[in-house]
Design a protein with these regions (language model features):
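Cytoplasmic membrane-interface "Motif A"-like loop-to-helix N-cap segments
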Residues: 59-61
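Short, hydrophobic transmembrane alpha-helix segments
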Residues: 21-30
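Structural signature of hydrophobic alpha-helical transmembrane segments
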Residues: 34-41
């Protein structure tokens, strides 16, 4: 029972990998793309569920927080890589997510050595703006919602709703903007861990 949140994280990451492999092999199969839409929503809902279970059952831990973020990053990069490989999005978006992820997660690793976490009471963020952009429920929730919609909707746009491609690309660019704007404070405030 104590590992339930982590098992959910493993399951959702495995689902993302599985559906991405299937879509990669059948990128024009309307039925598969429609399934991918629903499976992506399931992956995203499970991301919220693991945290809720950890809090409700008092199973929160530093490792659990790290593992959740790692699975989030893996899942995010799986979908963005898939979209870039299929040329559904510009390749530079994948580069942005990779570079941001490596830099931010690297700094968070150094912060973790000093007992700081990405979110919560032990957050590494000191400034109010930095905390708001990276750790506030509003920013985490709105970024999560934008990711959920843009990542899942991409499959519908390429199956039954091509008329919404411009809207989908707007959402992808908005998601990328959020990715960058939430990473900048970590880069700025994280410098203190290298002194």
């Amino acid at each position: 029972m104590s590992q339930l949140p982590n098992l959910i994280s493993i399951f959702r990451t495995t689902l993302a990998i599985g559906i991405s492999i299937i879509v990669l092999r059948n990128p024009e199969n309307e039925k598969i793309l429609n399934y991918a839409f629903w499976i992506t929503w399931t992956v995203i809902l499970l991301d919220g569920l693991d945290g809720i279970i950890a809090r409700k059952l008092k199973l929160e831990s530093d490792f659990g927080a790290f593992f959740d973020i790692a699975c989030d990053r893996i899942t995010e990069l799986i979908f963005i890589s898939l979209f870039a490989i299929l040329r559904w999005i510009p390749f530079w978006i994948l580069i942005v997510f990779l570079v941001r992820g490596i830099l931010v997660d690297g700094i968070r690793g150094f912060a973790g050595k000093e007992g700081k976490t990405a979110f919560g009471k032990k957050s590494m963020m000191k400034s109010k703006l930095g905390y708001f952009l990276t750790s506030s429920r509003f920013m985490r929730g709105s970024y999560g919602a934008i990711k959920a919609i843009s990542l899942s909707f991409m499959f519908l746009v390429h199956s039954t709703m091509p008329q919404f491609l411009n809207l989908e690309m707007f959402l992808i660019y908005l998601m990328t903007f959020y990715c960058v704007i939430r990473g900048v404070p970590v880069l700025i405030e994280g410098r203190r861990f290298f002194n």
